[in-house]
């Protein structure tokens, strides 16, 4: 199946909220600059884990999809990255809903529980 890669600014993704942090004014002092990630998300769990994904340029391949019982946040510090989004019904991907989206650096994403997604660092 071929899916056209589209820029985030040109699409709407059901179940995904986006924010470009580059549009926010950072707080500045003499020796640092701080930019908030102001998107808030209601999680089902109070046990929240965070991590940093670092990748290297390659030809992206999408042979899996993931989804979760809780919401998920992504912060793209560098970019671009290519992400696959797809609706899930009865535990299976609804391929007619597939979207390939180019995510620029400085983007914050909130992905609803149950929304299929996968990031390929490209």
Model-derived segments and their meaning:
Residues 1-102, 119-122:
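Active-site region of the double-stranded beta-helix
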Residues 107-118:
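Histidine-centered metal-chelating micro-motifs
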